[in-house]
Amino acid sequence: MSVPAEQLETFLPSELHFMAENETIEILPRRVGNPIKLAGTDLPLMHPLRKNRVPIWMAIALKKQQRCQFVPPDWMEESNLRRILAFEHANPTAFSNVDFHWLEIAQIVLTTAPDDLTSPPQVIRNLVRDIREVREQKSRQGMKEVNENMLQMDRLGALEINEMRPFVVEGMEEMIKIRKAGKKEEPIIYSESDNPEDDEDDEPTYGHDDESSLAVPSSQLDSSLRYGDRVDTSERRRELSQWDDNVPQQGGPEW
C-alpha cells in the first residue's frame, strides 16, 4: 500500500491516541471484576469503589458499559493546570514537567468521562488549550537554535514533538549539506617514514660493511675473509712453499 511521504515522517494524531491508550489510569469499579491475564499486564481482582489502575483502553471500554468511574490524573485538576500555565508564562525558555501523552490523555478524559472531572469540563478544556498554545509558541522560538547535531526537547509531549518533526528533520538535513559544501579538504602530510613514494624508490643495496648484512656472524669468520682485510704476502708465500714440498713429483704416485 502506497503511503504519502509526509505520513512516513510523522505519526497521525489517531496513531498517537492509540499509543496513549496503553498508558494506565485509575478507575473506581462499580462491580466486582475477576482478575484477567493479558499479554502486557495482569489485571487484579476489582472491588466496587476501590481504586484500581488499568490501561486506558480498558477504562474506556468499562466506562462505555457504565461499569467504572474515571479518576482523572492530578495534573488535570483546575488548580494544577493554572499552576502549569503560570509556569509556562514565567519561563520563556523552559517547559513544565507534564506527562509525555498529556494532550492525548486530556482529550480522552474530556471526551469519554467529562462527568468524572472535579471542575466544569469547559474550564479544563480552556486551560489545556491555553497551555498548549504557550508551549507551542516557545517550541517555535526554540527552533531558531537548532543545529545539524541536535535539538534540545526536554519535557515536550509526544504530540508536540510529532508536530515539529518534519521541520526539524528538514532543517538539520539542509544544515548538514551546507557544512559539507563549505568544508575544504585538508592536505595529507606524510612524514619521512610514512611517505609511500619513498618506499617505491628504495632499492636493496649490497656490499655494505655492516655486520647485519652478512649471512654468518663476523665472529665465526676468519680474519682473512672479512671485507677490507688483506693477508701478508710473505706469510702466504711461506704457506705455498710448504705445500709444494709435500706434493709428490710427477711420474706417478709414491706407494
From Swiss-Prot:
Stored InterPro entries: GINS_A, GINS_bundle-like_dom_sf, GINS_Psf2, PSF2_N
Protein name: DNA replication complex GINS protein PSF2
Span list, region Disordered: 187-255
Biased composition annotated in UniProt, kind: Basic and acidic residues: 227-241
Biological function: The GINS complex plays an essential role in the initiation of DNA replication. Has a role in chromosome segregation.
Chief localization: nucleus
Keywords: Chromosome partition, DNA replication, Nucleus
PANTHER family named among the record's database cross-references: DNA REPLICATION COMPLEX GINS PROTEIN PSF2 (PTHR12772:SF0)
UniProt xrefs under Pfam families: PSF2_N (PF25005), Sld5 (PF05916)
Localization: Nucleus
Gene3D superfamilies: 1.20.58.1020, 3.40.5.50
Assembly and oligomerization: Component of the GINS complex which is a heterotetramer of SLD5, PSF1, PSF2 and PSF3.
Family, similarity comment: Belongs to the GINS2/PSF2 family.
The keyword Iron-sulfur is assigned to this record: no
Domain of life: Eukaryota
Matches recorded under SUPFAM superfamilies: GINS helical bundle-like, PriA/YqbF domain
Compositional bias segments (type: Acidic residues): 194-204
A single BP term in Gene Ontology: nuclear DNA replication
Assigned GO CC terms: chromatin; GINS complex
Organism: Yarrowia lipolytica (strain CLIB 122 / E 150) (Yeast)
